[in-house]
Amino acid sequence: MNLEQSRKAIDEIDQQLVKLFTERMACAAEIAAYKKENNLPVLDAGRERQKLAAISEMAPDDLENSARCLYSLIFSLSRAYQHRLLGNDAELPKKIAAAIESTPSLFPPKAMVACQGVEGAYSQLACEKLFQAPNILYFSNFEAVFSAIEKGLCQYGIIPLENSTAGSVNKVYDLMLQHEFYIVRSTRLKVDHSLLVRPGTKLEDIREVYSHEQAIGQCQEFLKTLPNAQIIRCENTAQAAKFVAESGRNDVAALASRTCGALYGLTALAESVQDQGNNYTRFICISKNLEIYPGADRTSLRMVLAHKPGALYQVLSLFNALGINLNKLESRPIPERDFEFAFYFDLDTSIYSPAFLQLMAELPGICEQFSYLGSYSEVI
């Protein structure tokens, strides 16, 4: 058989496959009607396990895994189709619809907002980008910001999530696993670091440089020019600047913003010392309540998947099948569960699309743990 004959044979097989797939989905629709009438869940995990075992027996050894992957995707498509036929009558889509209905049309210009650090922190600058007149309450660390939201001390909290140079803020992702919250908005802030000192300090005098670990990671090349200086991490760039200002010493410096320099009376020995000129940090605005404002086009999710081959593939295949773009995937180890991870997903999708509603109905049933973290828009 030559190439053209082989391709023709494949075309004929594909015609049969599409016909059989259509017939299979028609059967799935009948099953959906039965499940609705008898108040049964769409997902029948036991039935799917039996089917996959049977498929494994039918497939030749060298195609067994491929056959299981194929049918896992078919099962996902079938469930999503059933959810759509049933009107996405699942709890999460209902919760999202209720939040859309109850959320005001405009993001609040004023609110009590929790920020980590002190006056001049980048979190403050991000907060002022999101709110016209925020009442900011400062906390010493990120965990305190999450706690302030959970306890109702503040309506919103501003948290840095990732940087274009240094990557994800791992400490924040780990805290996200421990706290209950929703993301209601995000923004990107251009981060420009200066080497700040007390007036009269010279570059050759510096023996200690203070800053947050993310800022230190963003300025590695510049710090190599200070081989005699000890690099000391602290909770916040603004706290570093405040410490230098109050230290009374002329052998210490801080990596922080020019805003901090002006605020604390410091001199910039060097400006824009970050490795990359386009250095941006993405901040999220969190709330205790689920609020979904008009224009929300990004959704964040957290999942703990079964510790078995193909579990992540099953989720990614569902995104692909529904035409939903994955913007970011992050994994973090789960405490006290060796080599098991929680996965964070950022998706680009309209909250009004049928595909989004199908996804929200489908995902909770295929995860060991599932958390919907919110749908929101990003302020540029």
Question: Model-found features: residue ranges?
Answer:
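Domain-level signature for soluble enzymes in the chorismate/prephenate branch of the shikimate pathway
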Residues: 1-380
